[in-house]
UniProtKB/Swiss-Prot annotation:
Catalytic center residues: 83 (proton donor), 114
Family membership noted in the UniProt record: Belongs to the GCKR-like family. MurNAc-6-P etherase subfamily.
EC number: 4.2.1.126
Name of the protein: N-acetylmuramic acid 6-phosphate etherase
Superkingdom field: Bacteria
Length: 298
């Protein structure tokens, strides 16, 4: 795909004179363009759903979810991966974010990093990629060599692969087994794909990781029942989660949480089934950690 023909590099007529308008009008132009992003994501929901099902199947079989990107795309993958352990109680290595240029590139531009095909392959080798894993390549342009090479290597190993880009028919889309391509159009600032394209990528990543966690039993109703209480706010949230799930008082919720070492799932089953902590945990273990199955089948 020729650089000048890429949609993400096109000129946006709506912002052609954005440097001449008032600050408020500037904000309106940006906001109006941002409004189009969820609609672009909506058009690819079937592709996102298919990717979630594949990711869940692989993770259920012992695999990992690996995000691979450069620049903004890489940072978004790292952001999504880093939020999974505290929100859903998963091990830090289950969802991994890799960025061209390594850790330094999270805050700084690393010259030439995204153009390194070798870097994409080596980063995957360094985390001992296996055929059980799913690699999600993220690149707004769809032409980033670091990402393309990583996807090619992953497919050679037998991994399932997903490509997220904002240009139709891109190399990332055609290299990956599953393509997710929200077409957001030209950016307000020409070529600044951290804007609409980045927003679209963030929305897609939200769905991928959240969908995985819901299907893995980490959500009951709409409650994050595996949240890890690492601060006072989350201690309070745990109490509210148990209250909302069971209808018990705050005092009952806190007592149950203390009895089970602050595991929301166990506390919820304790209250709803009138069990002690050991028996509640045993039943959850018997049903793979799914509260719904414990309640529905017993």
């Amino acid at each position: 795909m020729q650089f000048e023909k890429m949609i993400t590099e096109g000129s946006n007529t709506a912002s052609a004179e954005i440097d001449r308008v008032s600050t408020l009008e500037m904000c309106r132009i940006i906001n109006d363009e941002d409004k189009t992003v969820p609609l672009a994501v909506e058009r690819v929901l079937p592709d996102i759903a298919a990717a979630i099902d594949v990711i869940h199947a692989q993770v259920s079989g012992g695999g990992r979810l690996i995000y691979l990107g450069a620049g903004t795309s890489g940072r978004l993958g790292i952001l999504d991966a880093s939020e999974c352990p505290p929100t859903y109680g998963v091990k830090p290595g289950l969802v991994v974010g890799l960025i061209a240029g390594g850790e330094y590139a999270i805050q700084h531009a690393v010259e030439g990093a995204e153009d390194s095909r070798e870097g994409g392959v080596n980063d995957l080798k360094n985390i001992n990629l296996t055929a059980q894993d799913v690699v999600v390549g993220i690149a707004a342009s769809g032409r980033t060599p670091y990402v393309i090479a990583g996807l090619e290597y992953a497919r050679q190993l037998g991994c399932r692969t997903v490509g997220i880009s904002c240009n139709p028919g891109s190399a990332v889309s055609t290299t990956a087994e599953f393509a997710i391509t929200p077409i957001v159009g030209a950016e307000v600032v020409t070529g600044s794909s951290r804007m609409k394209a980045g927003t679209a990528q963030k929305l897609v990543l939200n769905m991928l990781s959240t969908g995985l966690m819901i299907k893995s039993g980490k959500v009951f109703g709409n409650l994050m029942v595996d949240v890890v209480a690492t601060n006072e706010k989350l201690h309070v949230r745990q109490v509210n989660i148990v209250k909302n799930a069971t209808g018990c008082s705050a005092e009952q919720a806190e007592a149950a949480l203390i009895a089970c070492e602050r595991n929301c799932k166990t506390a919820i089953v304790m209250v709803l089934k009138n069990l002690d902590a050991a028996e509640a945990k045993k039943r959850l273990d018997q049903h793979g950690g799914f509260i719904r199955q414990v309640l529905d089948k017993e």
